[in-house]
Amino acid sequence: MVIFDCNGVLVDSEALSTSIVSQEFIRAGFALTPDIVARYFTGRRPSDMFAEVEIAAGRKLPSDFALTVATATLRRFREELRATKHAAYALSWLRGPKCVASSSSHDRIRVSLEATDLIRFFEPNLFSAADVQHGKPAPDLFLHAARTMRVEPSECIVVEDSPVGVAAGVAAGMTVIGFVGGSHAGGQLGNHLRTSGAKAVISDLRALKSTIIDLRGW
């Protein structure tokens, strides 16, 4: 089975998402630039990010902050989000089981895939970190997806674009392919993904098929 992260892998959302989150932080009086959000929180659950910001700042975010961010994100995604280049091509040849496992909420996963016409490849196999106790880099989400799909972790390949996501896949006992083809990917991201445990790194989703064959012989 192939397990895909959503943001930054299937949809080119990371730059848009960090811009939205940063804007809402600044409106709430917290000076977090998009670069800071991307550097420290890419791949993390929003709830974990908000909790860490409150601890670091020594004060609470507004009580409706999570809802404000979620509402702004869904609106902008419906209007602006695009699929990662060649995502549909890469998915079209995958005949075996596949799913999405994302740190995002169920609503955001669904909106992301509907807006980019990728949901047809996955529904109903959409898994959110909201379903588990611990988000990435803990393995809980990937193990939950494998258990629900009735596939052994050792038979799973994870496609991830963040070091915390790669670490989660490795901790789950899965083979991880790093992806650096999103518009947010910096020059050192590939090295960071390898350091976190990715067995291979690709910059074009058209290379996914040959990479899986090289790693697993599928």
Where are the language model's segments positioned?
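Conserved SAM-binding loop
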Residues: 10, 98-101, 158-159
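Short helix-capping segments at alpha-helix termini
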Residues: 27-31, 57-61, 117-121, 150-151
